[in-house]
């Protein structure tokens, strides 16, 4: 039997449904915007911030001096050595050929095509310091920022940027001339030799309580690809055995997810950005604070100079650049090795050795190839002396990230290049840990290290 719903009851139900729908719609309109539309707006804000920081950070990394012209130009007057006496400076000046020979790099993308063609034809004299001034005016010398006179014949001011030590070029145009490779360690750069050319090294001598001749000896002891970022804190110019005390320039790529930076892990990436900008580049705008460095026993020079507590003249401006710089740095991926640069079959076998027999992954945890957290080990744990570790507040050595290792083999391995080859590193750990790896396993392991 079919039961029919009376028309009046059906109409009543429709009215109730309509009223409920209207009430729900009204509630939705009056509710806080936390739904999909708000999410889209928030996502857009994140995307906009990401793009802004990335682009700004690239500019900061490549071109920002943080006001360090006051040191390089006004104080030690390095620009005068670059100019040479024919352009108001001192000495013979620095030609492009000389600049390239000490590891400075030239960004080919900053040079107009017409001039590129002239260089390729040999129509530009690369032994003329005037050409260096022209390259500086074009912002073509990687990591050096200069303002020239109206006629381009002299340098009004000059400073350095992060890219000086932590960028190189791909040599696509000529050795030392090519497209920028941000984040790559410039292991050709002879920082000490370049600084030693400055006409006024007396401020450094006064800081270290020594003479200019000794300062030059120290600067020239480092050699290509090395720099001593602790000399102005502890004054230890040489190792106890008389060897130079500089460390290899580290890369600035593959840092996403990496907590501690540099060889002895004194701080995070933002820590080191402020440390370097304020105390090594000598940026006047940057504030840096670390009371650990005020200990007169460990850091007598810093305790005297106050470099553990610098207050920039425009810290707000600098801080607004340091966040973008950090964002850009952690956005730079570790470069993949070129195809054919390693034995793929051996690398596949070496990965198994890395993860198992050699115990490498215990500390170099994939995919970061360092340890998440506080990745510091004692000198005894890695089987070396404590000299460099004891210059750091950590008194230890950081587990260095291994991705992109193939890009910075020049100068050797470990913080001071004490191991000339990866084979030497593998042999060191084989003996230290009693691994008893076979010759084949060692070869395969090296190929894997070159593949990551």
Would you name each region that the model predicts?
Residues 2-16, 21-452:
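Periplasmic c-type cytochrome electron-transfer domains
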């Amino acid at each position: 039997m079919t039961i029919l719903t009376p028309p009046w009851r059906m109409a009543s139900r429709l009215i109730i449904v309509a009223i409920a729908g209207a009430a729900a719609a009204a509630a939705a309109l009056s509710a806080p915007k936390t739904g999909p539309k708000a999410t889209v707006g928030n996502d857009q804000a994140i995307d906009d911030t990401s793009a802004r920081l990335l682009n700004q950070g690239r500019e900061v990394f490549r071109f920002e001096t943080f006001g360090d012209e006051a040191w390089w130009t006004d104080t030690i007057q390095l620009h005068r050595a670059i100019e040479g006496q024919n352009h108001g400076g001192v000495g013979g000046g620095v030609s492009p050929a000389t600049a390239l020979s000490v590891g400075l790099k030239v960004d080919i993308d900053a040079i107009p095509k017409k001039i590129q063609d002239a260089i390729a034809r040999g129509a530009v004299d690369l032994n003329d310091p005037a050409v260096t001034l022209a390259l500086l005016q074009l912002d073509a010398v990687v990591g050096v920022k200069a303002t020239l006179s109206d006629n381009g014949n002299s340098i009004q001011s000059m400073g350095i940027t992060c890219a000086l030590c932590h960028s190189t070029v791909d040599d696509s145009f000529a050795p030392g001339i090519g497209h920028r490779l941000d984040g790559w360690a410039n292991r050709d750069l002879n920082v000490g030799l370049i600084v030693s050319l400055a006409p006024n090294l007396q401020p450094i001598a006064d800081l270290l309580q020594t003479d200019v001749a000794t300062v030059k000896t120290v600067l020239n002891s480092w050699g290509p690809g090395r720099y001593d970022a602790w000399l102005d804190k502890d004054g230890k110019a040489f190792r106890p055995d008389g060897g130079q005390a500089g460390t290899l320039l580290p890369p600035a790529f593959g840092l996403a997810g990496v907590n501690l930076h540099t060889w002895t892990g004194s701080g995070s990436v933002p820590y080191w950005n402020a440390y370097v900008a304020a105390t090594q580049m000598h940026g006047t705008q940057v504030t840096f604070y670390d009371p650990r460095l005020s200990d007169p026993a460990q850091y007598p020079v810093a305790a005297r100079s106050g470099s553990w507590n610098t207050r920039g003249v425009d810290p707000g401006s600098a801080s607004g650049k340091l966040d973008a710089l950090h964002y850009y740095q952690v956005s730079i991926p570790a470069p993949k090795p070129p195809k054919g640069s390693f034995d793929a079959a051996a690398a596949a076998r070496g990965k198994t050795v890395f993860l198992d027999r050699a115990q490498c992954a215990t500390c170099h945890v994939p995919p970061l190839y360092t340890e998440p957290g506080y990745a510091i080990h004692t000198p005894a744990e890695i089987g070396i002396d404590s000299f460099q570790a004891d210059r750091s507040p950590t008194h230890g050595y950081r587990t260095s990230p291994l991705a992109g290792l193939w890009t910075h083999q020049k100068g050797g391995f470990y913080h001071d290049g004490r191991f000339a080859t990866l084979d030497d590193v593998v042999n060191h750990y084989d003996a230290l840990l009693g691994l008893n790896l076979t010759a084949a396993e060692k070869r395969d392991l090296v190929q894997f290290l070159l593949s990551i």
